[in-house]
Every structure is written in C-alpha cells, then in structure tokens.
Regions:
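Short, Lys/Arg-rich, polar N-terminal cytosolic tail immediately upstream
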Residues: 1-13
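Cytoplasmic membrane-interface regions of multi-pass membrane proteins
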Residues: 2-5, 74-85, 160
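Structural signal for the C-terminal ends of transmembrane alpha-helices
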Residues: 34-35, 71-80, 166, 213-217
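Transmembrane helix-loop-helix hairpins at the membrane interface
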Residues: 136-234
C-alpha cells in the first residue's frame, strides 16, 4: 500500500499561500463577471471625472494581480525585497529579460499590430493627459504601480512560492515559471491561425524566459521592467 506523503509545516504554509492568492484573484474575477460591463462603461465615460474611473480600474487590476500576494506578505511578515526587489543583479535581470521579449516584439512588428509605443497607457490615459501636468504625473505613477509594478511582481512572487513548494533541480525548468506562463497566456485572447500560434510561441518565450531569469538572478526587477516598458506598452 502506498503511504501518504506527510507535508512539512513549510509546505503546508506554501499551500495556504497559493490558495490565498488563487481565491483572492478568483473572487475579483467573479465580481468582474457580474458587473464588468458596467465597470467598463463607467471607466470609458469621458463625461465623468478621470479620478474615480482610474480608481475603479486600479482597484480591479490590483485585486487580480497584487492583492493576493500583499495579503500573503502581511500574513507571513515578509517584505517585498525578500522576493527579489533588490539592487543586486537588477541590471542583469532587466537586460536578460529584454532579450527574452525580443521575439515577441519582432512578432508585434511583423504581424502589423504595432500602433505605437505607449508604456503606461490604459483606457483612461487620454483623459488623464487633459487634466494638467501635475495630475498627469500622479495618474501615470498610479498606472505604473498597478499595471506595471504589481502585475510584474505578482508573477515573480507566485513563481517563487510554487518553486519553493515544488522544487526542481533543473537549470531551465521551473514549475513556477511554467504555471505562471500558462496562467498569463490563458488570461489573454488566443487564436489558432498562423499568427495566433506565433503569438502563443513568442509570448511563452517571453514570460517563461522572464521567470527563468528571475529564478537564476533572484531579482524581480526584470519582471517589473517588462510589464512597465514592454508587455503593456505595445
């Protein structure tokens, strides 16, 4: 008879952490599924002040990518730097991450999808630019925080937790990197024509490569950089 493997206290904690992150994001997705169309209509309504629209959009974004890992950090008394937000290897992580995104960037140009380089641009950005320079700067920092920092850092933290829970002695494979990459791909529109398959391949290379770089450098700034200046910019 096969004996049941007994989990260590650390493994149990990591399982709880993953459940917290998953359930938090799921709860926000459920809310979005119920009232998402109304929220989108509200956020796109230029007759309403840009600030409440930005706040609503940022709240939903943070709920999906950021709230769960923040709860885990508070619960475990962990700091963000403990997950790789540090100076050491930061340039190496950023440089290597950029290389991982090169095939994806080439795909954007070759497929004719390039419409301009617009980092930190979301649906309320045009109205934000009409509010004056100071307000634009503040709003842009908010966008950078929720659509750049937290989205990129969210990948790093989840990857870190999965890798600690399911460690693999491999240089180029990581359960955390694989799961996070598939998660990122599944939550974006897909098609299965030639261009769709090329997009799938280049997206996989970009995200998986980014997280393998994180695994080797133990520096999360590459992930953050990618989501501020590449992923949400083209």
């Amino acid at each position: 008879m096969k004996t049941k493997k007994i989990l260590t206290d650390e493994q149990k904690k990591l399982d709880i952490d993953l459940w917290i992150i998953a359930l938090t994001a799921t709860a926000v997705f459920v809310v979005y599924a119920m009232i998402g169309s109304r929220l989108m209509t509200f956020c796109k309504d230029s007759s309403i002040s840009v600030w409440p629209r930005l706040f609503v959009a940022a709240s939903m974004q943070f709920g999906i990518a950021g709230l769960g890992i923040t709860i885990v950090c508070i619960l475990r008394k962990k700091t963000f730097p403990s997950f790789g937000l540090k100076k050491e290897n930061s340039l190496k992580a950023i440089g290597a991450t950029i290389l991982c995104f090169v095939p994806y960037i080439i795909y954007i140009f070759v497929s004719g999808q390039f419409e301009g380089y617009e980092p930190l641009s979301i649906m309320v950005t045009p109205d934000l630019h009409k509010t004056g320079i100071i307000a634009t700067i503040i709003g842009t920092l908010v966008i950078a925080l929720f659509w750049g920092f937290f989205e990129g850092f969210n990948y790093a933290v989840i990857c870190n937790i999965i890798d600690r829970r399911y460690p693999v002695n491999s240089k180029f494979f990581s359960w955390g990197a694989l799961v996070c990459t598939l998660m990122g791909i599944l939550f974006h529109p897909m098609s299965f024509d030639l261009l769709g398959i090329l997009e799938l391949i280049t997206t996989f290379i970009a995200l998986y490569g980014m997280l393998i770089i994180y695994k080797h450098t133990r520096n999360a700034w590459g992930c953050v950089f990618a989501f501020i200046f590449i992923w949400n910019a083209f």
